Amino acid sequence: MSVLRNMILDVGPHIQEKISYRIPFFYFHGPLCYLSPTFDGMYIGFVRGHQLSNEHGLLEKKDRRFVRSIHFYSLAELEEREEQIRQILNEAAILNEYHYRQKKKKKQTK
């Protein structure tokens, strides 16, 4: 979990970590992603996952409307997909910043 946590924190200096629902959540202009252990590995869930491009085909929908996740069964699998995960994390951060700026712009026009 620490390898994936470090990848998330490497996205930028303004990433904040908070424990919610007994799991680590990461925030950047709102909720960005979270890490969740499973009995056979762990997964990273992206809060705005339904808006991500998923060009690598790694994001899974399962039975969720908005959240998309990537399940890892081993550290080797995580290391093998490191570059793709970093790209998804960066895209998620850019998306959150975009939505934050749009919301801020709407408030200024009122």
Residue ranges and their predicted role:
Residues 1-110:
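Charge-dense, helix-prone N-terminal extensions
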